[in-house]
Amino acid sequence: PAGPFRIPKCRKEFQQAQHLRACQQWLHKQAMQSGSGPSWTLDDEFDFEDDMENPQGPQQRPPLLQQCCNELHQEEPLCVCPTLKGASKAVKQQVRQQLGQQGQQGPHLQHVISRIYQTATHLPKVCNIRQVSVCPFKKTMPGPS
């Protein structure tokens, strides 16, 4: 089957990592709070180098993000993007249900979904995973799926 898990080993890692539970919560939280506070997603949001030298500085990661980074560091580099893609997909389904119940479909839903993928794309870089910087998800609006 196609989809994010063309590499069987990664599917197994995804299940062992409990589907990156902390990352899913983080993606969900980021996508839903549109436009409030630092988003931790965009390239110029903060300087990663300073972050490395000064771990206790003002850029300290929220605990949930730290948990998510720990989950990603346990993955093999090869599997980081496929497992993140799996997590993004799971969050997309949650959000679709949630907004569907509130009757908020359409443009708002598309906006939230694109935020999920945008956040996921940059997670390896935010988490300082050496071998992976940005996952090549399509940033464009996802079509019907």
Curated annotation (Swiss-Prot):
The protein's role, per its UniProt record: This is a 2S seed storage protein.
PANTHER family: 2S SEED STORAGE PROTEIN 1-RELATED, BIFUNCTIONAL INHIBITOR_PLANT LIPID TRANSFER PROTEIN_SEED STORAGE HELICAL DOMAIN-CONTAINING PROTEIN
Stored Pfam families: Tryp_alpha_amyl (PF00234)
Gene Ontology molecular function terms on file: nutrient reservoir activity
Superkingdom of origin organism: Eukaryota
Region described as Disordered: spans on this chain: 34-62
Similarity comment text for this entry: Belongs to the 2S seed storage albumins family.
Protein name (record): Allergen Sin a 1
Effect of residue 111 to Q: In 1.0103/SA2S2
Residues that make up the propeptide removed upon maturation: 40-54
Outcome following mutation: residue 130 to P: In 1.0101, 1.0105/SIN2, 1.0106/SIN3, 1.0107/SIN4 and 1.0108/SIN5
Gene3D superfamilies hit by this protein: Plant lipid-transfer and hydrophobic proteins
Organism whose genome encodes this protein: Sinapis alba (White mustard)
Keyword field: Allergen, Disulfide bond, Seed storage protein, Storage protein
Assembly: The protein consists of two chains linked by disulfide bonds.
Ranges of compositional bias, category Acidic residues: 42-53
Effect of residue 125 to R: In 1.0104/SIN1
